[in-house]
């Protein structure tokens, strides 16, 4: 049976401070962890959301070791490890070492004098927590903020940012070489598991050489030579894909295949359609000279959900990841976030955001502000109809006399100046809480990563308000 929590101890009682004689009790990190600990103890709903995922049958299957021994870590410890990881910016290995060596971290994560699990165990448990549960946990935390009168929801500001996926810059030659490399590796493992009947030719060296020549090629007539190199690389990739398809067909009729062989065959079956897509887009762009639409491009065979985001920013013409919309109140708490697929316009989110805001706070925001990308006449009308008294969104382009006068109003300028503060909050999320780049794999894990970062950020903001009180 999965344990939900360990026996509760007062984190800062004297009997647990024997190892902390050298720690200054006015240390900001110590006080911050103390406040976060109190918030988590006060809100069992947050732990319930996490425990539901870890204790579910699917969660138990993911956490079962090869030998059938369950992972010895409670849901509460997993939640606190996830929070500490994002709060301090640790990798999983650094997190396990820091908890093991620091008595304050041991107390915060509720390990006390127990043996700290291996970092891979901590990783597996944290990755079980779903994005839906983190959304619910964040909502429960916001309700606590409302109850403590930290946030009233009377003023709201919006902005978007891009969270990158963990991929290399997408180049056709690199994508083609990646498909050859991974297909060859899987075919090699399938042959080891299934015997010599699974035959293939290893073209990975030739593929790597062609990809390298394409990337570093210089000199005269480079475009013509690069096209010839691409033709050869495309030919190699096509040959490897054909071999992979033959191996998958053989594996389908092989009843005595081991578990490893079946796993390799399943991965081959999943990768082959992606290899066809990579071949198609490279052929269209390089050989035929077509402009491939962004929604038809595959940017990575590992993170297939990655989108191209073009926001027109100087120095970053294109970003690879997902656009995320954030709404924040006067307290600095993130009251709402939404991860998008594709690259929708920012002006499409206001109506949904207002509906969610009313569901959370019970009333519309009296003041709403956002940058010019959110502007549309429909958005201003919707905000006013839902009860917004002051809506400050700069209209791009030509302005008539009435609009110019509106932009000069003191309340309008005050709201736009206040809106600028969200840039600093987003910078903190990106730099301090790991939202610059998501290192978790798959679309669901991407959403969960954003969720745990926002939850940790809100916990720190709420803890800061509690310390001031």
PLM regions and their residue ranges:
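Charged, often Cys/His-bearing segments associated with DNA-binding zinc-finger transcription factors
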Residues: 1-53, 468
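Basic, short loop/linker segments at the boundary and entry of helix-turn-helix/winged-helix-like folds
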Residues: 30-83
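Trp/Phe/Arg-rich N-terminal binding region typifying the photolyase-homology
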Residues: 63-75, 89-134, 146, 156
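Short, conserved catalytic/metal-binding motifs centered on acidic residues
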Residues: 81, 95, 116-122, 152-164, ...
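Active-site- or DNA-interface-adjacent structural scaffold in DNA-acting proteins
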Residues: 112-303
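Basic, amphipathic alpha-helical segments enriched in Lys/Arg and hydrophobic/aromatic residues
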Residues: 268-274, 410-469
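Electropositive, glycine- and tryptophan-enriched low-complexity nucleic-acid-binding patches
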Residues: 305, 313-360
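Helix-centered, glycine/charged polyanion-binding patches within enzymatic domains
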Residues: 367, 372-439
